[in-house]
Structure formats: structure tokens, C-alpha cells
Amino acid sequence: NVGRVLNYLDENGLTENTIVIYSSDQGFYLGEHGWYDKRWMYEESLRMPFLIRWPEKIAPGTRHEQLIQNIDYAPTFLEAAGIERPNGIQGKSMVSLYEKPNSQNWRKYVYYHYYEHLTEHGVPRHDGVRGERYKLINFYSNDGWSLYDLETDPDELKDLSKLPEYKDTLIH
């Protein structure tokens, strides 16, 4: 149906004045890590689709790897519409990412927090920080930690938090 919407916009001369966004509020597990759900801070749940068609700013096929969050949506939509951003709104406008794709002036980390505890899904409370290379998860109900190197272990199967050579990584 997304294709039908895009075709309609094209056929009716509306493409140049319309920004189309396809996204979600989270990713979803399809058996990875033994889950068919969400709630954990693994990449399958943390990553969410964000596809945008904006002919005025973005060339077709453009791909960005910067860390964005759903708190960035409102500032982006406001700037795209030319509306002044209200005080106190969280997040950053992504418009600068489209104007300067290799910009170094973007966040290096994102924060995640799952606050429910052992509901019907059995997931303990946890929060964490994901950077470009590492992800640190804190299971604060039981003071447990997990650390993953997303460059060498993109499937997050090897917890490095107990290995002494990663002590400095945990501190920073």
C-alpha cells in the first residue's frame, strides 16, 4: 500500500510538496535471541525503520547510519514544515543529516529504558546506552551488566562485561 500512495502522489503532481515517512515505534524479534516480541535492548528491538521520501532534500537511495530516536521526529517535522520549535521539546532535527550527510555534529549515543519488571514476558528492568560500536546494558533490578561490541559481534551473542580487557570500555 505504500507503493500505491507513492504512485498516487506521483500521478497527481504532489510528490514535490509531500514528505512521506515510513517508520515504527520499535523493532521486533522474529525468533532472534529466542524472542517473538520486543522489550529487550538488542538491536532487533532497538532498531526501527525510518524511510523517508523528500525529493527536495534527499536523493533516492541515500542511506544514513547515524543514531536517531523517535524523540527526533517532532523537531524534524517542525523544521521541515518551517514551524518554530517550542522550548522544552526533546530530540534533534534530522534535517541537518540530509543537508550534510557526513556531519560529525550528531549524537554519538542513544539511551534506552525498559521499566516494567517480569511481566507476562519475563523481561527484567533494564536500561542502557548504545554507541556507534559498543552497547552497555544495565539490569538494575539485580545489578547485572552486559556489554557488546557491535562491530565484531553484530548479533550480540558474546557478553564482554566480565572480561578484564573491556574494563575501560565499561568506564567510558
Task: Show where each model-derived region lies.
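Well-ordered alpha-helical scaffold segments within catalytic/enzyme domains
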Residues: N1-L9, A80-A81
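Histidine-centered active-site microenvironments of extracellular/periplasmic hydrolases
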Residues: N7-T62, Q69, Q90
